Swiss-Prot record:
It comes from the Eukaryota. This is Mitochondrial morphogenesis protein SLD7. Interacts with SLD3. Keywords: Cell cycle, Cytoplasm, Cytoskeleton, DNA replication, Nucleus. It comes from Saccharomyces cerevisiae (strain FostersO) (Baker's yeast). One of its GO terms (biological process) is DNA replication. The keyword Cell cycle applies. Belongs to the SLD7 family. GO terms for cellular component: cytoplasm; nucleus; spindle pole. It is found in: Nucleus; Cytoplasm, Cytoskeleton, Spindle pole. Disulfide bonds: none annotated. Its main location: nucleus.
Amino acid sequence: MSRKLCTLNFTLSGKQGSLVIRDIQLWSNRPTASKSTSEXRGQFIQYVDLAKLPLWVRSTNMNTYRCYSTSATAQAYFKSKLRNANRGIVIELXDKVDQRSQEPAYLIIFRENTELNCFQVDLTMKHEFDGQVTKLKQDIGKTRASVSKEGSIDIIIQQXQQRKIGTKTKVYRNVHINDKRLQFNETLSKLILGGLRLRGISNSITDYQKLYKITFDAAEFTHRDELKRISMGSGEEVSFESLQETVETLLKLFTKS
């Protein structure tokens, strides 16, 4: 046996102001605990295509209510707006909320053949989806944070290794440069000492140290370009023959007298 549940009035807002669609009676074929008939108020939200509604909007065990109205305005409105069988009218109920989310409750009024029906939007599955999406975002956030942290550690380790390699390379380079310069000094010193001995100049002579030093300094100046390239790591060792020729020339010049 059908029983009247409530009478719905909802407001339309437009350029001409607000129009109230009155006396929409909702009837149910299922038994209900309450025997009183309530007055419900609502606000028009939008028109929807029923074929494109998400699956969670309407559950399989949801109540569908029959709608009647004695208002000529309401009858004309529904006849005009629900010509398309796939069209629905979304109404936000002003004095009823969804028990789970405490958000406003919604009705969708539609036409099925010649009858006017409506159902309340089921938000249960939507809340489950929202909860899963929120959890998924949190999990993704944690994963990204972990990946970012691990990535940062990897970068730090890599940078440390590169610094170590760079330091070692620099040390090896400096050692190599020092070896070349040391080899130059040793060779130059031996050539000068040998040249002085060949000329019969012993270290007992007063100007021996002075002659050694000016020859050494002059040889360094002669090969200053090669030594500069060596200090920059791009030069080759000064050949023995070239250095020997320089020392001989300088000693001839300094020992003429």
